[in-house]
């Protein structure tokens, strides 16, 4: 997935969930949009180097968006969780998700379920069970362990219930955890953050719902991040 043209700055603070103040290399201060509703643990600290993009939209109050954080150890994390579905869509098209590579038809944002939900992707293929795929981001990393979620997610809990219902109706149901951080090679659910999500997903997996985690990798050109892709599945610790 190609990233938009990026410029760097220093994070001053994030506030009101969707806003951040940054200091430009010129010393000027600018407010930008933050498309992340999570806690952003470890990837949104004062003084962090961040990368932001610009939009030409005339309707946006804040035309710049926080895209990436570059950590002190050099690792990168895409904090714009809107990118996760773009990333997975490209990976599905390119048959990079081996567990789903047999599907040829990809339908994004399809209404389904009894709780008024939209599935991120509905996959279809001749002679195959329909496959409902819910995408979740991995931005929380400790050591080399990626975790999700980074905040309590009642929406995520609802999605697990909906997926289990689809499985019981005879379809495939998958939670795909997409790496937006390039510093992990193992994955587990952050049960200490959202024990209910952990419980629901474990119970769903016992009844046939599938869950996979994929690592992310950034491409760098002239010291500027230019692309992000999913590389390979990582060990899923249950």
UniProtKB/Swiss-Prot annotation:
Molecular function GO terms recorded: DNA binding
Any Pfam family: SfsA
InterPro entries with a match to the protein in the record: SfsA (IPR005224), SfsA_C (IPR040452), SfsA_N (IPR041465)
CDD domains reported in the protein's UniProt record: SfsA-like_bacterial
Family recorded in the similarity comment: Belongs to the SfsA family.
Protein name per Swiss-Prot or TrEMBL: Sugar fermentation stimulation protein homolog
